[in-house]
Regions:
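Nuclease catalytic cores that cleave nucleic-acid phosphodiester bonds
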Residues: 2-11, 15-154
């Protein structure tokens, strides 16, 4: 008996931060703030789409760093251990999932896109992710506006 299909959005955190101009600008002076802005955006996206969000930040060049996993609302934030890239974590994670799961990986790294496609996931570029986020926000606003209008009419 197979389990229920799950929908995932896996985000290569620093790759997306460096691809989005507004986050890249913030990261120059405050990397933590840029991470939080990305986390907030993915929380909102995951709430709207129902996807399980996973953001992976690598600690590849940080000495003596242990893997840290943090849960926030409907997403998981992963800080990889020393010498582990976000790419290797993402590849291993995808390999652990069921073939029935729907997995999207957000990265601009072409080599990583090819690897995740080979593992059965789909890829989404930083630009496509940004457009999806903007569309989700627009639909949330529309939904809230129509709900507000219904309340006013009653």
């Amino acid at each position: 008996m197979r389990r229920n299909k799950k929908d995932y959005l896996i985000v290569d955190g620093y790759n997306i931060i460096n691809a989005w101009d507004e986050l890249k600008e913030i990261a120059i002076s405050d990397l933590e703030h840029a991470r939080e802005k990305l986390i907030d955006a993915i929380i909102e996206y995951a709430e709207f789409t129902g996807r399980l969000g996973i953001i992976v930040f690598d600690a590849y060049n940080i000495k003596s760093c242990k893997e840290k996993i943090e849960k926030r609302k409907n997403i998981t934030i992963v800080y990889t251990k020393e010498y582990q890239t976000a790419d290797s974590y993402i590849e291993k994670f995808i390999g652990s999932l069921s073939k029935y799961d729907d997995v999207k990986v957000a990265t601009n790294d072409y080599a990583e896109q090819q690897i995740v496609l080979g593992k059965g996931a789909s890829r989404i570029t930083s630009r496509e992710l940004k457009l999806d986020l903007e569309n989700a926000k627009s639909k949330i606003r529309e939904k809230n506006t129509s709900a507000h209008k219904k309340i006013q009419r009653n």
